[in-house]
Amino acid sequence: MLIEFFNGFVKVTGWPAQKLIFRTKIYYEDKQAQGRHIRGGAMVVSNHTSVFDYAAYLFVFFTRTLRVQMAEVLFQKQPLGTFLKMMGGIYVNRDTHDFSFMRESEELLNKGKVVGVFPESRIPKPGEETPLPFKPSAACIALAARKPVIPVVTDGNYFGKGRAHVLIGKPIDPRDYADPERPEKENIQALTDAMRERIIELERLLDERVNAKA
């Protein structure tokens, strides 16, 4: 409850500033299938362009509290680490074999919460092909919780003279990839591949939508 309250406070007080910083234009693959309001438990998966992706999505999905998986390095910086804990950030230690973040994410989904994941696990470096290969943990969690996966892409155009652009895609049902005749590892890989392919498709669609308005 405290996490929801703190998120609400941050979003209400930060609304004027984000209008200047992000000026986000939101597009939809199919608004009837999935709009900005997320009903029930769901996982939001996105490409990763900047440390500000999380901040932008707080306001894109204004009506829900995003419990986002975050790298250990962010929690090591103060006072940022304390702030992220208060916002409900899910601690992910990429340097160890601690998978407690997966259990925590699944539990949150089963409680009807919204979990945010950047499956690339880091921001791509200049010159790298994007999106980077997806880590399998997101698919593993989605298959276990059997909650919809909402693919979202951003162009990361923050702080510029233009505006940020975000496209919300149609949900992916992980149950479509839970084939009892296949080994679990193959199901996880199939969903991982499907999520990455959808992000690539949505990046192309977002580029088309933005350029059509130019």
Predicted regions: what they are:
Residues 2-5, 102-214:
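Non-catalytic C-terminal accessory region of glycerolipid acyltransferases
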Residues 25-27, 96-100:
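Glycine-rich, highly charged phosphate/nucleotide-binding loops
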